[in-house]
Amino acid sequence: MVVRSTAAPPTPWSKDLAEPKIHESAYVHSFSNLIGDVTVCEHVLISPGTSIRADEGAPFHIGAATNIQDGVVIHGLEQGRVVGADGHDYSVWIGDRSCITHMALVHGPAYIGNDCFVGFRSTVFNARIGDGCVIMMHALVQDVDIPPGKYVPSGAVITNQQQVERLSNVTEADRAFAKQVVEINEALREVSPGATNNGSRIAANQQPTPSSSTNTSGTSEHQSVGNMSLNGDLYNQVRGLAAQGCTFTAEYANKRRFKTKSWLSAGFVEGHSADQIIGNLNRVLADHAGEYVQLIAVAPNSKSRAAEIVVQRPGDSAPVQTSTTASYSNNGNRSNGTSAGSQAAAVGGDLTSQIHALASQGCSFTAEHANTRRFKTQSWLSAGFVEGHSAEQIITNVNGLLGQYPNEYVQVIAVDPHSKFRVAELIVQRPGETGTLSTKATASARRSGNKVVNTASGGDVAGQIAALASQGCSFTAEHASTRRFKTQSWLGAGFVEGHSANQILANIQAIAAQFPNEYVQLIAVDPNSKTRAAEIIIQRPGNNAPVQTATATSSFSGGTKAAPSSNGFGGHSSGSLSGDVVSKVRSLLMQGYKIGTEHADKRRFRVKSWSSCGTIDSTQEAEVLRHLEGCLQEHSGEYVRMIGVDEAAKRRVLEEIIQRP
């Protein structure tokens, strides 16, 4: 038998209680409980699961545009009052535009001023909080009077006035955090199916006041979140999250799905810098015009959502603003690969460099296609495997698929060879786009003008250097003639000063001008280990020198095509070594690591059964390279991988395939 109970059980004080006075524009969820003499002013938001009981201590006042979030409890003692801003006595006074967040407890007598923020699970009892104060999470504020504009940190216990005197002032970052929490919660104003503008859940022993009608006020959305795509803070948020290594995805929903939080995936938002991410996000906004779109930031370690930002709502048309700083390129203009107004994503050099990087990690590739209707529901159809042992072959085969599915969406899927999970989803064609992926995204750019060579995407270079600079890396430069470059005998060119990517790029360009017709590379040095974090060649005397970089994604040329004998993975069937392998050998030797090799035929490679070729005892770079080339020739037609070993820790620090059949 079902046991039924009232929404708010009667108490000894609940007889002959006054009725709540709720403004017609207030937004009170039907799953919240209001009892007694409670004044709810205009544009107040009261979320589900709140309990506001003015039965023992009364009255309560909740000021205009105040936000009461899920699970908040507001109660008062029978004795004890505070003087409100209007000069009358109240058990609990909450001022205008304040925010009481999830699971917080406000127990009267208590006074909370205007523009205040009370964090998750914090408690305010017998206290007076001045205007503009910010109380963070799990804090206790009791028996004190806090002056305006003070900051109470998370977990603080403030129970005497001496502790109050030591509190710091609120900063802009604190206000920005409070604003973000309020904006996200206020989305309930237009999405919750159980809410009405003034339909509060009154206790069973009370009748609603005549003013509590069920008609919808035209001002119900007055405090809803605006078009965040027009907010310049979004760019700073994305830049900060990207600097933390977060990856980004997007989701969209129509009005019906938005009400039930049934978001549909819009895929990954690719990019190495905030400009690239915002540019790709603008494409998503254009694809889902008239719908809700939110950007998801995923933490790299916990794989959990670090942020959810609604960037578009129905009726919004302006694109997300990007940084006004132009990306670095050798002709002073913004690279077509990152321009928001570029043609197909397929012609973007950024996609080409990403495929190069993924191929160098040994990923396998598949393709999917969808028409406009299927794209909206993410119902992709398989287009089969994309064959190829090198990035150039893969790109060529992808271009063939683009011709098979004109006026459709086409995306390339990169699959990790070990975990068999998708590591990237790249949309390379959209309806109305006719471009193709280029294997030489900036070859023409490098032939003209000055000698400074940038990547397939100038913004990518700035993004890489910005990321390295944000990690605290310092930068130096080296140069070498053609003869010295062959033996990797670089000469120092001094430190590269600068506090931003643009300053560093400008200074390295000035250094490159001092050494015309020579190789110049930029070195990023890790501040903790004092080892090289990246090596980026930015100038070459001609177009025949091999691309060399310490990481798979930091090649400055980005479009150099492998020689016909190259297998596309850093090794050559002829027994010669690529510049990338030479660079990594040099880096391993500089850090004191030993280098060894292993080989496997096709059958053994499938089951990961490698045979050791032994460790190279020498620490001389030339001798190690000679041993590696000999190993490649000895095991021609087989897989060969290079091993970096830390003998002190007895562990491998590098495993890289340098030859494939």
UniProtKB/Swiss-Prot annotation:
Keyword Repeat recorded:
yes
Polar residues composition bias: residue spans: 194-204, 319-342
- Known post-translational modifications? Identified as 2 proteins of 70 and 46 kDa in gels. They are probably the result of alternative translation initiation.
Biased composition annotated in UniProt, kind: Low complexity = 205-220, 549-567
Tell me, according to the record, the phenotype of the null mutant. Single gene deletion does not form carboxysomes, and does not grow in normal air but in 2% CO(2), called a high-CO(2) requiring phenotype, HCR.
- Annotated region (RbcS-like repeat 4, SSUL4) at 578-661
Residue ranges, annotated region (RbcS-like repeat 3, SSUL3): 456-541
Say which domain of life the source belongs to: Bacteria
Alphabetically list the UniProt keywords.
Bacterial microcompartment, Carbon dioxide fixation, Carboxysome, Photosynthesis, Repeat
List the residue ranges of the region (Disordered). 192-228, 312-345, 545-575
Q: Which InterPro entries match?
A: CA_gamma_LbH, CcmM, Gamma-CA, RuBisCO_ssu_dom, RuBisCO_ssu_sf, Trimer_LpxA-like_sf
Compartments it resides in = Carboxysome
Per its UniProt record, what CDD domains does this chain match?
LbH_gamma_CA, RuBisCO_small_like
The similarity annotation says: Belongs to the gamma-class carbonic anhydrase family.
- Assembly, per entry: Probable homotrimer. Full length protein (M70) interacts with CcmN. The C-terminal RbcS-like domains (SSUL) bind to holo-RuBisCO, as does the M46 short form.
Q: What does this protein do?
A: Functions as a scaffold protein for the assembly of beta-carboxysomes, initiates carboxysome assembly by coalescing RuBisCO (ribulose bisphosphate carboxylase, rbcL-rbcS). Produced as a full-length and a shorter form; both forms are required for correct carboxysome assembly and growth.
Query: What name appears for this protein in its UniProt entry?
Result: Carboxysome assembly protein CcmM
Source organism: Picosynechococcus sp. (strain ATCC 27264 / PCC 7002 / PR-6) (Agmenellum quadruplicatum)
Q: Which gene encodes it?
A: ccmM
